[in-house]
């Protein structure tokens, strides 16, 4: 296996892990970064599969919580509601992804779409944060979420199908806009990532498994492990951050990064293809 290809897969995994749970669009970063380092895997599953490595970091970080839920389903009211909320929040994006996923990948998976959505999303975060600073959140614990709250977060997640929007950004901001406290919305976004990314990975693997080679599997494993380790670091760091701070720094980062992408395009460093 070529060392340069291995290094690129490792770098892509690190980018995925560090950005998956931040409201800055991991998919957008993978598209742009992959373009910059000229990383083009031989199949369409690499990026979605290494995202599963980052999601595994959430499972590891909250392993006791997930264990309690698994043992409590069918017996414990709190566990039942937790699973129900995840299912409700999962459905909107899953349905829309099945209906329009092919068209979205064909027409919107390019640096221009990413740049536009990064900038728009940055301004949206600024607005949501300003709005929450003026009103006391109605819900301050994940276990207090109602099915209607989960549905609103699920509807917000639909926008994340467009690259550059950010799955975590859309669900966290959607939750905050609905009156959910910042850290609570962040934790539920973490939990929701598990069924969402497991389903997306399974779908893409089943769809493209015929095109897998041993070379592809090796690159995926490298990216997977890198995404898991960096994802674990990101989850811990973000939870500490939102306990004391807000998401405004990420909003400015999105705006600057989006503008930088356009500058890179104008200078010829990246292309829209």
Curated annotation (Swiss-Prot):
Keywords: Antibiotic resistance, Cell inner membrane, Cell membrane, Cell shape, Cell wall biogenesis/degradation, Hydrolase, Membrane, Peptidoglycan synthesis, Transmembrane, Transmembrane helix. Pfam families: BacA. Its EC number is 3.6.1.27. The keyword Transmembrane helix applies. It is a multi-pass membrane protein. The keyword Membrane applies. GO terms for molecular function: undecaprenyl-diphosphatase activity. It catalyses: di-trans,octa-cis-undecaprenyl diphosphate + H2O = di-trans,octa-cis-undecaprenyl phosphate + phosphate + H(+). One of its GO terms (biological process) is response to antibiotic. It is found in: Cell inner membrane. GO terms for cellular component: plasma membrane. It is an enzyme of class 3 (hydrolase). The chain crosses the membrane at residues 13-35, 45-62, 82-102, 108-128, 186-206, 219-239, 250-270. Catalyzes the dephosphorylation of undecaprenyl diphosphate (UPP). Confers resistance to bacitracin. HAMAP family: Undec_diphosphatase. Bacitracin is thought to be involved in the inhibition of peptidoglycan synthesis by sequestering undecaprenyl diphosphate, thereby reducing the pool of lipid carrier available. Belongs to the UppP family. PANTHER family: UNDECAPRENYL-DIPHOSPHATASE. This is Undecaprenyl-diphosphatase. It comes from Neisseria meningitidis serogroup C / serotype 2a (strain ATCC 700532 / DSM 15464 / FAM18).
């Amino acid at each position: 296996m070529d060392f340069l290809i291995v290094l690129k897969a490792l770098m892509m995994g690190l980018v995925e892990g560090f950005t998956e749970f931040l409201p800055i669009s991991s998919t957008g970063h993978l598209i742009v970064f992959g373009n910059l380092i000229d990383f083009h895997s031989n199949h369409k599953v690499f990026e979605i599969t290494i995202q599963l490595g980052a999601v595994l970091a959430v499972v590891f970080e909250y392993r006791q919580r997930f264990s309690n839920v698994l043992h409590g389903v069918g017996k414990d009211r709190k566990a039942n509601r937790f699973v129900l909320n995840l299912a409700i929040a999962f459905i909107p994006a899953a349905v829309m992804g099945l209906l329009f996923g092919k068209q979205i990948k064909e027409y919107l998976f390019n640096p221009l779409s990413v740049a536009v959505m990064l900038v728009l999303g940055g301004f949206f975060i600024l607005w949501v944060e300003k709005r929450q600073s003026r009103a006391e959140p109605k819900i301050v614990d994940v276990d207090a979420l109602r099915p209607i709250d989960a549905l609103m977060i699920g509807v917000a997640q639909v926008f994340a199908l467009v690259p550059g929007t950010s799955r975590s950004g859309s669900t966290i901001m959607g939750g905050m806009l609905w009156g959910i406290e910042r850290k609570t919305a962040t934790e539920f976004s973490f939990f929701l990532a598990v069924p969402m990314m497991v389903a997306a990975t399974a779908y893409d693997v089943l769809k493209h498994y015929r095109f897998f080679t041993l070379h592809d599997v090796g690159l995926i494993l490298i990216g997977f492990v890198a995404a898991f380790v960096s994802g674990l670091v990101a989850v811990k760091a973000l939870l500490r951050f939102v306990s004391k701070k807000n998401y405004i720094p990420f909003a400015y980062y999105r705006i600057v990064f989006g503008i930088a992408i356009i500058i890179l395009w104008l200078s010829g460093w990246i292309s829209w293809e």
